[in-house]
Amino acid sequence: MKKIIRFLLCSLLLVIFFVACGEKKEEKVVTEDKPIVIGQTFVVGAIEPTVGGTPWSLTTHGLSETVFSVDRNGNLVSRYVEDVERTDKLNWVLKLKKGVKFSDGTEVNAEALAWAMNTVMEENPLSNATAGKVKFEKVDDYTVNVTVERETQNLKSLLAEWTNIIFKKGDNGYIFTGPYIIKNLEPEVSLTLEPNQYYENSEKRGEVIIKAISDMASMKLAFESGELDMAFGITPEIAGELKDEGKIVETIDAGYQYFGVLNTATGIMSDKSVREAINLGLDREDYIKALKGGRVANGLFAQYF
């Protein structure tokens, strides 16, 4: 029964805890020249935009962006695409925005976007999960034809998947479109970032240093000693301790869910009455209390869909 309960389809929207320097009654003044130092559990090991889960890491570090993304209200938005039109079962047309640039100042036009997406589709098989190997073809400077291998109902959602980041090859490595660029990388140890001058509001950003600290107790000590300005991805227990100390603790929705799927074809779970009994017997609010975060699922998809 424990295994049955463990794998019951009962997804919770995850939350991530982070803590920032300062106390609620005080406001620290930080000089413009002082970098913001962030501790989190990992730093990317290599700048390889089509290898495994690396594109997700590059985006979380502020270096890259997917073609579409989800805003805080659950809407699919894009800095790059003005309009998406479906022309038939397998074909779509993207109309691009003008003036959006890579961090080297060159424009993200149809040729650049099509090259990036085709490279992703060819080199990272994880990008083929939703609609097969998708093909992108330049029509003119700001128009791209998209042909999917398998039918999809929402191309925007596909283009928001973490594999589908925009990038190009430069003389000294890859060039991206996110709010920051790399100043220095010590693989899997630390990453120093500086603002991408071609990204909006770049003048409001300063240098950022991300340090990899896998041990939560060590991260807590580093924050308390002043080595870190922010500790990201801390556990609920440590978040509670720091909040009790008067530190500023915030939570954000992680924006994804985990699912457990039952085998209803054979065994005890093939009996609908058993499934209904387990469903009624579980107190989902107790799960949230035990996990110290999240929300009760209202279906297979996040509530904003």
Where are these regions (language model features)?
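C-terminal motif of bacterial Sec signal peptides marking the signal peptidase cleavage site
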Residues: 18-20
